[in-house]
Amino acid sequence: MDLVKLALEIGFSHAAPLNASALRALPEVREMCASGRCRRYGSSWSCPPACGSLEECQGRMRAYTGGVLVQTTAELADDFDYESMSKAQEVHKKNFFTLARQTRLLIPDCLPLTAGSCTICRSCTCPDRPCRFPNKMLSSMEAYGLLVSAVCEASGLPYYYGPGTLTYSACILTKEG
């Protein structure tokens, strides 16, 4: 299955084979989650600490040998063009959910890691009740301790596409090179 081709057909701006051997769960990335910058730490099943310890996340990633890295790049009118930023995030999330769903049908043993926390449910049940959709839930690359810029570099895609742009990145790990 050519996941790069599928990703581009779905509408991602960029896609490349994922260098899974370069994935490293870093404590400093997880510490950014714990600092509460996105306000999802401890309140989403897809985020730390509910998504597992750094060691557990690294162990899950180690089981995979390949995959695809995908990106959505938007042009911004200026540094405060929140409308374009929000639209790009919405498009990226929608496209990634489609890619994850299709990949899970084709390759059931895969690990999708999105940009930002899971947004399948309007309100997460964490920590009071179990996840409503554990088979659809999407953790983020950052929740798994990944420094996104390093993953992009190791996989041959830029992280930054120049002034006036914003790029969202996500990946799907597979056991197929």
What are the language-model segments listed below?
Residues 1-19:
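TRNA-binding/sensing appendages of the translation machinery
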Residues 13-44, 48-177:
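Catalytic cores of enzyme domains
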